Regions:
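Catalytic phosphate/metal-binding cores of nucleic-acid and nucleotide-processing enzymes, i.e., regions
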Residues: 1-76
Length: 76
């Protein structure tokens, strides 16, 4: 899996799926309470105090790219 985040603390992965989002969060040590389950916009937020740490493990892209990943791969 490849992880992507932006400077607004949004976090997704490819291949994109709810199951993979949860696996990614577990791998990065992010609690499930940071998951946003709004249909068609599912993603994790990065806890502010861990932003730099998590960014070092991801490809940092702009917010439009995060939305593109979600939109192209979301079942809803």
């Amino acid at each position: 899996m490849k992880y992507y985040c932006d400077n607004e603390r949004h976090l997704v992965c490819i291949p994109y799926s709810i199951e993979n989002l949860h696996k990614m969060a577990e791998d990065l040590g992010i609690k499930r309470c940071w998951f946003h389950n709004k249909k068609g916009k599912e993603h994790y937020d990065i806890p502010k105090k861990r932003l730099k740490e998590i960014q070092s493990k991801c490809e940092v892209v702009d917010g439009r790219e995060i939305l593109k990943i979600i939109k192209q791969n979301s079942p809803g």
